[in-house]
Amino acid sequence: MISYKYFTFNELTRSDTANRLKIDNEPKEEATKDNIKELMLFLDGVREGWTEECKGKGYGDAAIVVNSGYRSEALNKAIKGSKTSEHLLGTAADIEPKNGRNKEFFEWLREYLSDKQFSQLINEYPDKFGRPSWVHLGIKGRYEHPYRCQVLTIK
């Protein structure tokens, strides 16, 4: 049995928006549940690396907050998400560091991912200093080449 150190299944599937709108956001397909577990394991590795970075640079708390993980089709439609969103597959999360070092986290994550397979790393809605509002991390896409290794910025 695989042990997950930092992230829970509930954390990757909960949604305040779904609760408020009374939308069922529980994944039904086993493949989606497996994807979420794979994402949890990947995020555990990210957290381990970020913990070391925070210790070395004196950044403080290395916790990573999941703002959005898996989204059911109904939830994705309600928030006007992309029809091809990796959140629908359970292979993406919008995350940010609890310590507020969003820019440093994004830059560190880009370097951390440089020798790994992933789909997308997106700096979402950065401020004038380049600090993302959050970071989107997709580990596996739905395309012929699921590991696109794209690093993008959405303004």
What would you call each of these model-derived segments?
Residues 64, 93, 135:
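A broad, low-specificity signal marking well-ordered, structured residues that form hydrophobic/aromatic
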Residues 1-59, 130, 148-155:
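Extracytoplasmic cell-surface/polysaccharide-interacting catalytic and binding patches
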Residues 44-80:
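Extended, low-complexity, intrinsically disordered C-terminal regulatory tails
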Residues 84, 89, 97-155:
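Catalytic cores and adjacent binding grooves of peptidoglycan-active enzymes
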Residues 35, 39-42, 75, 91, ...:
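Amphipathic alpha-helical interface surfaces
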Residues 11, 16, 74, 79, ...:
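Solvent-exposed, flexible loop/coil residues
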Residues 59-61, 88-92:
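Short connector loops at helix/strand junctions that flank enzyme active sites
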